[in-house]
């Protein structure tokens, strides 16, 4: 009998050659909110327009501090008529909830992490055909969120069709995992989903990169995760000023390389600095920060980073973890 233990890390491949794959997204978590004030409360907290969020849609969003810098990013959506939920990186959720609860003191709002749900990603060849054996209707670009008893499905269109399954009922997960005989199906860890997010240009702000960047630096405006027409929210004044005066000097990039020289055998991790040598190799200049990375099956590495826009797009750079400069790499940089 298949279970979550089947989702061990396997070779990571590009979306163009991805077979039908289920991925265990243990690095994400579902946060539920309920109460009579949830709409107004979240509208005053998140960068997106909660008041106009449709029941069949989700929205990219960011939660900022007073300086307009992202505490984290998330996908926010309705899970029923009375509850709103969002999905965010697991390792930031304690900090995130603690900050949000400070502003919920005088509101009828309850914020609860759901540790009992299972988040599964589905993508690759024949993914729609596979899911249609269980669900008559799948979410798409128009109806991005669909609910069934015990499960919610979200659709993501980039870099290829993929689905996030929010499974509330363990028996549904068991059924999905043990009714796959008609399909050649692979099981992988969240690292494959990470690779797809990097391809898609979907940012990942976790504990190590929390409160470092304005949302525009993570392309949240391009992803329609910022409403510039709504009322005030935390950090709104600075976020709006950056947009109005075109002051954003950073952007989200996809970095890829076939050469990776690292004596410590360490991949870049969230929060690592990206630096350049300057002035006869005596001075290190900080030019960016790693958000997430993965090593592909063919050996090259794929990195998501926020870089200064003034950075030269093809050059040799180094990674710095704490005080250790541990590797150099020749990069090809693709802006998303």
Curated annotation (Swiss-Prot):
Q: Does the keyword tRNA processing apply?
A: yes
UniProt subcellular location = Cytoplasm
One record GO biological process: iron-sulfur cluster assembly
Coarse class of the protein's main subcellular location: cytoplasm
Entry keywords, A to Z: Cytoplasm, Folate-binding, tRNA processing
Query: Do you know which Gene3D superfamilies this protein is assigned to?
Result: 2.40.30.160, 3.30.70.1630, Aminomethyltransferase beta-barrel domains
One GO MF term attached to the UniProt entry? folic acid binding
Gene Ontology cellular-component annotations: cytoplasm
User: Which NCBIfam families does the entry mention?
Assistant: PRK09559.1, ygfZ_signature
Give the record's family classification: Belongs to the tRNA-modifying YgfZ family.
Outline what the protein does.
Answer: Folate-binding protein involved in regulating the level of ATP-DnaA and in the modification of some tRNAs. It is probably a key factor in regulatory networks that act via tRNA modification, such as initiation of chromosomal replication.
Write the protein's name: tRNA-modifying protein YgfZ
Q: Which organism is it from?
A: Blochmanniella floridana
